[in-house]
């Protein structure tokens, strides 16, 4: 496993990380989570991602209990969680000072931890002044409940505004953004965020490297495997949107490239994401140890992605966004 700094911070995170979205509390219980997490550690993963909203908090409970029972040293791992959707009440969601503080304390209780390493604002909140959110995230850091803070699915403008507020108030700005990034979702990472890397040293922990499994090739025959996330009731609409013929045709076109390198489609897709120098860590998911073992081999695929190979991939997927002319 390779380790990178998370943005311009001194925090080292594994190139590949593990996220609890969908799986913990929906498809996996504590016993299964323990084997999955230990398999990740055995492959050098030190970074594990969660959120207060995942399985309505159950994902944090499962991860916390699993880590406790595994007996891991807290200093050996990097844990992140995300705040925004905490419950049904009017103050149980969003990025007000009240919800950030109360939501963080509730997450730590579920995780059974004194702190998380990174706390994300899970979405932007137009109803709360950015100064209030920045102050609240700094309060959480000052209390020792989190060491760093970041954003998830924010726009470049919103992140720039957060940094502007932090600079004005002489406070800590966000060091990391968590966007979707894969061969079919590239605009933010490759164009919109370009000024953020230069101006603020923002790092990225990207999610959905396999486009919800589409880039594994398992949906290419049209049928949805019963153990896949698209088989879950909540993800039926996602399945209909993602499994369009054009995308599946492109995935099929990637197969010869993967075969030539002697790797799987999943390994190729994950390595492709990790090869972007602005990506600090690629968040992966899995329901079985065998999936983790396959995914982790993507680290060895990164050096194989020469400019020639990347060009071959681009000719198939044809999804490269145009860079804005105004940015140098």
UniProtKB/Swiss-Prot annotation:
<keyword id="KW-0407">Ion channel</keyword>
<feature type="binding site">
    <location>
        <position position="210"/>
    </location>
    <ligand>
        <name>NADP(+)</name>
    </ligand>
</feature>
<dbReference type="GO" id="GO:0016491">
    <property type="term" value="F:oxidoreductase activity"/>
</dbReference>
<feature type="binding site">
    <location>
        <position position="285"/>
    </location>
    <ligand>
        <name>NADP(+)</name>
    </ligand>
</feature>
<keyword id="KW-0521">NADP</keyword>
<dbReference type="GO" id="GO:0005886">
    <property type="term" value="C:plasma membrane"/>
</dbReference>
<feature type="binding site">
    <location>
        <position position="209"/>
    </location>
    <ligand>
        <name>NADP(+)</name>
    </ligand>
</feature>
<dbReference type="InterPro" id="IPR036812">
    <property type="entry name" value="NADP_OxRdtase_dom_sf"/>
</dbReference>
<keyword id="KW-0560">Oxidoreductase</keyword>
<dbReference type="GO" id="GO:0034702">
    <property type="term" value="C:monoatomic ion channel complex"/>
</dbReference>
<comment type="subunit">
    <text>Forms heteromultimeric complexes with potassium channel alpha subunits.</text>
</comment>
<keyword id="KW-0851">Voltage-gated channel</keyword>
<dbReference type="GO" id="GO:0005576">
    <property type="term" value="C:extracellular region"/>
</dbReference>
<feature type="binding site">
    <location>
        <position position="207"/>
    </location>
    <ligand>
        <name>NADP(+)</name>
    </ligand>
</feature>
<feature type="binding site">
    <location>
        <position position="294"/>
    </location>
    <ligand>
        <name>NADP(+)</name>
    </ligand>
</feature>
<feature type="binding site">
    <location>
        <position position="211"/>
    </location>
    <ligand>
        <name>NADP(+)</name>
    </ligand>
</feature>
<keyword id="KW-0633">Potassium transport</keyword>
<keyword id="KW-0406">Ion transport</keyword>
<dbReference type="GO" id="GO:0034220">
    <property type="term" value="P:monoatomic ion transmembrane transport"/>
</dbReference>
<dbReference type="Pfam" id="PF00248">
    <property type="entry name" value="Aldo_ket_red"/>
</dbReference>
<feature type="binding site">
    <location>
        <position position="208"/>
    </location>
    <ligand>
        <name>NADP(+)</name>
    </ligand>
</feature>
<dbReference type="GO" id="GO:0006813">
    <property type="term" value="P:potassium ion transport"/>
</dbReference>
<dbReference type="InterPro" id="IPR023210">
    <property type="entry name" value="NADP_OxRdtase_dom"/>
</dbReference>
<protein>
    <recommendedName>
        <fullName>Probable voltage-gated potassium channel subunit beta</fullName>
        <ecNumber>1.1.1.-</ecNumber>
    </recommendedName>
</protein>
<feature type="binding site">
    <location>
        <position position="218"/>
    </location>
    <ligand>
        <name>NADP(+)</name>
    </ligand>
</feature>
<feature type="binding site">
    <location>
        <position position="295"/>
    </location>
    <ligand>
        <name>NADP(+)</name>
    </ligand>
</feature>
<dbReference type="InterPro" id="IPR005399">
    <property type="entry name" value="K_chnl_volt-dep_bsu_KCNAB-rel"/>
</dbReference>
<keyword id="KW-0630">Potassium</keyword>
<keyword id="KW-0813">Transport</keyword>
<comment type="function">
    <text>Probable accessory potassium channel protein which modulates the activity of the pore-forming alpha subunit.</text>
</comment>
<feature type="binding site">
    <location>
        <position position="21"/>
    </location>
    <ligand>
        <name>NADP(+)</name>
    </ligand>
</feature>
<dbReference type="GO" id="GO:0009506">
    <property type="term" value="C:plasmodesma"/>
</dbReference>
<feature type="binding site">
    <location>
        <position position="178"/>
    </location>
    <ligand>
        <name>NADP(+)</name>
    </ligand>
</feature>
<feature type="binding site">
    <location>
        <position position="152"/>
    </location>
    <ligand>
        <name>NADP(+)</name>
    </ligand>
</feature>
<comment type="similarity">
    <text>Belongs to the shaker potassium channel beta subunit family.</text>
</comment>
<feature type="binding site">
    <location>
        <position position="287"/>
    </location>
    <ligand>
        <name>NADP(+)</name>
    </ligand>
</feature>
<feature type="binding site">
    <location>
        <position position="291"/>
    </location>
    <ligand>
        <name>NADP(+)</name>
    </ligand>
</feature>
<feature type="binding site">
    <location>
        <position position="229"/>
    </location>
    <ligand>
        <name>NADP(+)</name>
    </ligand>
</feature>
<feature type="binding site">
    <location>
        <position position="49"/>
    </location>
    <ligand>
        <name>NADP(+)</name>
    </ligand>
</feature>
<feature type="active site" description="Proton donor/acceptor">
    <location>
        <position position="54"/>
    </location>
</feature>
<feature type="binding site">
    <location>
        <position position="27"/>
    </location>
    <ligand>
        <name>NADP(+)</name>
    </ligand>
</feature>
């Amino acid at each position: 496993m390779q380790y990178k700094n998370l943005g311009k911070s001194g925090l080292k995170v594994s190139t590949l990380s593990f996220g609890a979205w969908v799986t913990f509390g929906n498809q996996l219980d504590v016993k299964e989570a323990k084997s999955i997490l230990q398999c990740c550690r055995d492959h050098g993963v030190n970074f594990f991602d969660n959120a207060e909203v995942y399985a309505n908090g159950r994902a944090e409970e499962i991860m916390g209990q699993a880590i406790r029972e595994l007996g891991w040293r807290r200093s050996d791992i990097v844990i992140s969680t995300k705040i925004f959707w905490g419950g049904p009440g009017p103050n149980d969601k969003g990025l007000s000072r009240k919800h950030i503080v109360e939501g963080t304390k509730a997450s730590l209780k579920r995780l059974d931890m004194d702190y998380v390493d990174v706390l994300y604002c899970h979405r932007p909140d137009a109803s709360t002044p950015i100064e209030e959110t920045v102050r609240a995230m700094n309060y959480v850091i000052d209390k020792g409940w989190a060491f760093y803070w970041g954003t998830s699915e924010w726009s470049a403008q919103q992140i720039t505004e957060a940094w502007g507020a932090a600079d004005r108030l002489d406070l800590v700005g966000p060091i990391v953004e968590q966007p979707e990034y894969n061969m079919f979702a590239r605009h933010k990472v490759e164009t919109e965020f370009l000024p953020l890397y230069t101006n603020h040293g923002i790092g990225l922990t990207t999610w959905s490297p396999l486009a919800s499994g589409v880039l594994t090739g398992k949906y290419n025959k049209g049928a949805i495997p019963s153990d896949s996330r698209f088989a879950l009731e909540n993800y039926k609409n996602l399945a209909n949107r993602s499994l369009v013929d054009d995308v599946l045709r492109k995935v099929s076109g990637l197969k010869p490239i993967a075969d030539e390198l002697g790797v799987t489609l999943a390994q190729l897709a994950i390595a492709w994401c990790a090869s972007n120098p602005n990506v600090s860590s690629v968040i992966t998911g899995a329901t079985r140890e065998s999936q983790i073992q396959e995914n982790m081999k993507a680290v060895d695929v990164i050096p194989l992605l020469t400019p020639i190979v990347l060009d071959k991939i681009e000719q198939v997927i044809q999804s490269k966004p145009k860079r804005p002319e105004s940015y140098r």
